[in-house]
A protein has these predicted regions:
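Non-catalytic DNA-binding core/recognition domains of DNA-processing enzymes
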Residues: 1-4, 18, 105
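Short conserved catalytic/interaction loops centered on acidic-Pro-aromatic/His motifs
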Residues: 5-13, 176, 180, 188
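Basic, Lys/Arg- and aromatic-enriched nucleic-acid-binding interface segment
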Residues: 6, 10-76, 84, 95-99, ...
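Conserved beta-strand positions that form and line the central face of beta-propeller blades
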Residues: 17, 89, 126, 159, ...
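Residue-level detector of conserved, well-ordered beta-strand and adjacent loop positions
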Residues: 19, 91, 106, 128, ...
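Catalytic-site neighborhood detector that most strongly recognizes the C-terminal catalytic loop/helix
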Residues: 26, 34, 89-98, 110, ...
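Short, basic (Lys/Arg/His-rich) helix/loop patches that form interaction surfaces
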Residues: 45-57, 66, 103, 111, ...
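Residue-level signal for tight coil/turn positions that link beta-strands
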Residues: 84-85, 107
Length: 210
């Protein structure tokens, strides 16, 4: 109608005063459904006992330890790892924010690529594909492994990031540090989706008068 008024095809816009917000309901964004913190130990035990392939089992472990994005994990190459410095360096072209990212590796996390190195058979990929080792692991491999473990609809590879954020917030780690490791921009929808524990903890302190 605005087009018609501007081009003298109509004298007035009869719906000009109607706000679409009062007619069309805005869909509320919902956070992902994922395994709760209390269930995390069982999930990790299930990962340890996974028998669907050693590369996949180790990929799940490394994702749990580092909580990087699935693409950042499966496309990793050996040149990105600094074993002496206990870290991996993800180049900007592989990052969603197009900035280089350093992933510190704990003793447990560092043990995983050491195991994978023995299974690499000379591949440049840390996680080579099952069929063609010239390619990296499929981005569905981790998801389907979680399905086979009984976590369909409750856990994806991406959800390890949310679980990690919740656990670290509950343990009192600084929010800014967690966001930095997750490579989030402050105050965006993604940050809000992952941050379950921070406001609960703050609310509890407020209720206690702290």
């Amino acid at each position: 109608m605005r087009y018609a008024v501007v081009h003298d095809l109509a004298g007035a816009n009869p719906v000009a005063g109607i706000r679409t917000s009062g007619i069309i309901r805005t869909r509320r964004k919902r956070n992902y459904v994922r395994v709760g913190v209390a269930e995390l130990p069982q999930l990790l035990r299930d990962v340890d006992g996974y028998v669907g392939g050693e590369h996949t089992r180790l990929a799940l472990k490394l994702m749990a330890y580092t909580f990087v994005r699935t693409s950042e994990l499966i496309q990793a190459t050996w040149s990105e790892f600094e074993f002496a410095a206990a870290r991996s360096n993800i180049p900007p072209e592989r990052m969603e924010m197009r900035k280089p990212h350093i992933v510190p590796l704990s003793r447990q996390a560092l043990a995983v690529p050491n195991e994978l190195k023995m299974l690499s058979f000379g591949s440049d990929w840390v996680l080579p594909g099952d069929v063609d080792r010239r390619k990296c692991m499929s981005n569905n491999t981790i998801l389907y492994a979680l399905y086979r473990m009984g976590y369909r609809g409750r856990m994806t590879g991406h959800d390890f990031r949310g679980v990690a954020s919740t656990v670290l917030h509950e343990q009192g780690w600084p929010h800014a540090h967690i966001e930095l490791q997750l490579v989030h921009q402050e105050q965006d929808d993604t940050s809000a989706a992952y941050n379950h524990a921070l406001y609960l903890r703050t609310s509890s302190k407020d209720d206690a008068g702290l």
